[in-house]
Regions:
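Boundary at the C-terminal end of the N-terminal hydrophobic targeting segment
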Residues: 17-19
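Flexible C-terminal active-site loop/helix
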Residues: 22-30, 41, 47, 55, ...
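Metal- or metallocofactor-binding catalytic centers and their adjacent structured scaffolds
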Residues: 24, 53, 58-126
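Conserved, mostly hydrophobic/aromatic
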Residues: 50, 56, 115, 128, ...
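Short, basic, helix/turn surface patches
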Residues: 85-90, 201-202, 225-226, 250-256, ...
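Metal-dependent enolase-superfamily TIM-barrel catalytic cores that perform enediolate-based chemistry
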Residues: 131-242
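Catalytic alpha/beta core domains of metabolic enzymes, predominantly
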Residues: 230-235, 239-322
Length: 356
């Protein structure tokens, strides 16, 4: 242990004396198929790529900005422009760096996540370890990922289900007209388990319960964010009556949100773009477990950079939804793989990625 501590101190002193290069640039993610949600449809997602270099070692990070987060390429790049690179000179001081970023502006979690991910990638490379190894996690415990299928025409749906064949769990977006027909169509193709994401699409607890009772007979694992994120009482009422677990998504962003949700939900969906990065996401998983809640690790539509960063936490999760990189046509990185439907973590130092 003393040797490990001595090495850690040496590494900190080594990197803290070097100049820091911070680079960032917009990068639009092109979707392979239109992505249909309860409230919108889109064919691309804006993103910003981040690179932090110290002593010729580069860490990569990413900000993905789906519209509901309220961030944009403009807001992310403006925030990143505020950062003094010298404040990143000790990349191991994550708590201090997050405090510094919070002092620059509140919110901006996707922008902060990009810095956080790049710092994790950088420090892992300096230590020569993947972050799941640094966390002390067993990669064999990483669950199978779900694969998202959205509302579409019957022909298009058949094509998407064919693409989803290698995956053991299907994720379905509900809360839009025709969503029950979508489930029935899927059931005519496959009996694989389904997890349902409503994206706040049901309007009342009674409507939600009616749908959940129907879903409970169709091999559904859980229901994600059935009601408005602000409807705490509605979710508490629903949780008492639901035969399926109720998982918070839009209602939870950081660990500060979790205690109030413990009576309303059975679990939480942790996403790096909501939490501000891996540092906070790890805290969230630990706190949720302490409160007896289920843990899901999810993602936005992202390259393999952010998805592989989230995957470092996968062994902590009951479920993972890490297919964001599979949904885009212009990935910049190679990273974690899905083998027989299961998240497989490479031992590549950092967050497990290599730039193409």
């Amino acid at each position: 242990m003393e040797k490990i501590i001595a090495l850690f101190v040496f590494l900190i002193s080594l990197v803290s004396s070097n100049a820091v290069e911070l680079r960032f640039y917009p990068y639009e993610l092109k979707l392979r198929h239109a992505f249909n949600l309860a409230s919108m449809s889109r064919t691309s997602t804006p993103g910003v790529q981040v690179e932090i270099t110290i002593d010729s070692i580069t860490g990569y990070g990413e900000a993905s900005m789906p519209p509901y987060l309220g961030e944009s390429v403009k807001s992310v790049t403006e925030f990143l422009s505020l950062i003094d690179p010298s404040r990143l000179s000790d990349p191991f001081a994550l708590e201090d760096i997050h405090a510094y970023m919070d002092s620059l502006a509140t919110g901006n979690r996707a922008a902060k996540a990009a810095i956080d991910i790049a710092l994790h990638d950088l420090t892992g490379k300096i230590m020569g370890r993947a972050w799941y190894q640094i966390y002390g996690l067993d990669p064999a415990l990483a669950p199978c990922t779900s694969y998202t299928v959205s509302v579409d025409s019957p022909d298009e749906l058949s094509r998407k289900l064919a693409e989803a064949e290698p995956y053991r769990i299907i994720k379905v977006k509900m809360g839009v007209p025709g969503d029950r027909e979508l489930i029935e169509t899927i059931r005519r193709h496959t009996d694989r388990p389904i997890c349902v994401d409503v994206n706040q699409g049901w309007k009342s607890p009674e409507e939600a319960l009616d749908n959940i009772m129907w879903l409970a007979t169709r091999n559904v694992l859980f229901v994600e964010q059935p009601l408005s994120k602000s409807d705490f009482e509605g979710h508490a009422w629903l949780r008492e009556r639901s035969p399926l677990p109720i998982i918070a998504d839009e209602a939870v962003q950081t660990s500060a949100d979790i205690p109030a949700l413990a009576r309303c939900y059975d679990g939480i969906n942790i996403k790096l773009m909501k939490s501000g990065g891996m540092h906070e996401a790890y805290k969230m998983a630990v706190l949720a477990r302490a409160l007896g809640m289920k843990v899901m690790i999810g993602c936005m539509t992202e390259t393999s950079c952010a998805v592989s960063a989230a995957a470092q936490l996968a062994p902590l999760a009951d479920w993972v939804d890490l297919d964001g990189n599979l949904l885009i046509a212009n990935d910049l990185f190679d990273g974690m793989k899905i083998v027989d439907g299961k998240v497989t973590l490479p031992s590549t130092p950092g967050i497990g990625i290599e730039k193409r």
